[in-house]
Amino acid sequence: LRFTGYNCIGCCPDNPIGLHLEFFEDGDDIVAHWKPTTNHQGWINVLHGGVQALIIDEASGWVVARKLSTTAVTSKMNVQYLKSIYTDDEGLTIRSRIAKMMRNVAFIETEIFNGAGDLCTKAELIFFCQNKDKVAQEIGFTGCDLEE
């Protein structure tokens, strides 16, 4: 994405304090791989829950952008922290998908897995999707490309 003022903490590659998440498509899912550092901890060597929520929100927004070719706003996010994620983990996998649509409302499921493949965090989100034509006209967004 390249828009004037674009500096997303989740995905902007130029944001010096950002997570620099990159997404690709795997069937119905949008997927990212990311490695935490000690700068992302809450308790000693444990990935902060707020950082996990940020990752979940970002992946969910990307699934809307890619699968529906529009933008959306988060209305509700219900996160379940199932297992601690450690900041020295070899790398996380984030998976997000649209579970169902009702008019302009997307119901999204997103999960974070640790390097061993264990499900550590899962969330259900509700996003209000913007009208595609309005988004295209007002900000020039007509969809997005993902990493191959």
Protein language model features and the residues they cover:
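Hydrophobic residues in beta-strands and at strand termini
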Residues: 34-36, 81, 129
